[in-house]
């Protein structure tokens, strides 16, 4: 079992949360003007880097609010959580990522 820190409710079991994709991706100003290729790129083409990644999560089994998290994709460790609409926090990674 892993605990995820909800910025509204505190630490909760991972089974209460649902993943929502990459965070800080700008929604197209007018999606109706996009070609199918452009729309599919917006929907499906995301970075898949190893290391710290900004993600969207929803506390579906609790407050039902969306929030963002910085998670290490190599270790699955959550490094920071912050409310939707807040800027991405800076992480102090001097001396390693742990």
Swiss-Prot record:
Record key words, sorted: Cytoplasm, Metal-binding, Oxidoreductase, Zinc
Molecular function GO terms recorded: metal ion binding; sarcosine oxidase activity
Residues annotated for Zn(2+) binding in this entry: 6, 9, 59, 63
Catalytic activity: sarcosine + (6S)-5,6,7,8-tetrahydrofolate + O2 = (6R)-5,10-methylene-5,6,7,8-tetrahydrofolate + glycine + H2O2; sarcosine + O2 + H2O = formaldehyde + glycine + H2O2
Protease keyword on record: no
Pfam families assigned: SoxD
GO BP field: tetrahydrofolate metabolic process
CC per GO annotation: cytoplasm
Cell location: Cytoplasm
Top-rank lineage group of the source organism: Bacteria
EC main group: oxidoreductase
EC numbers on record: 1.5.3.24
Assigned protein family: Belongs to the SoxD family.
Protein function: In the presence of tetrahydrofolate, catalyzes the oxidative demethylation of sarcosine to yield glycine, 5,10-methylenetetrahydrofolate and hydrogen peroxide. In the absence of tetrahydrofolate, catalyzes the oxidative demethylation of sarcosine to yield glycine, formaldehyde and hydrogen peroxide.
Oligomeric form and interacting partners: Heterotetramer composed of subunits alpha (SoxA), beta (SoxB), gamma (SoxG) and delta (SoxD).
Record protein name field: Sarcosine oxidase subunit delta
Organism: Arthrobacter sp
